[in-house]
Amino acid sequence: EMTLICTADDGTEVRLRTEAMNDSEGKLVTSDDLLGKNIDIRGIVDYYAGNYQIKVFSYKHILFNN
């Protein structure tokens, strides 16, 4: 699992938490794979460690825009 702090288009910080995920080639996805990328996600609103976040369960729920 990993938690990423992302910035929405309006400047709002959004916490994104993922389960351990593999990409389409079976490689483990790390924060380096998402760093600096513009993404759209599909997940659920969750509460973890005192913060609301969006939890993503599958790599296919992350759409890369760049």
Regions found by a protein language model. Give the residues of each.
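OB-fold single-stranded nucleic acid-binding module
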Residues: 1-66
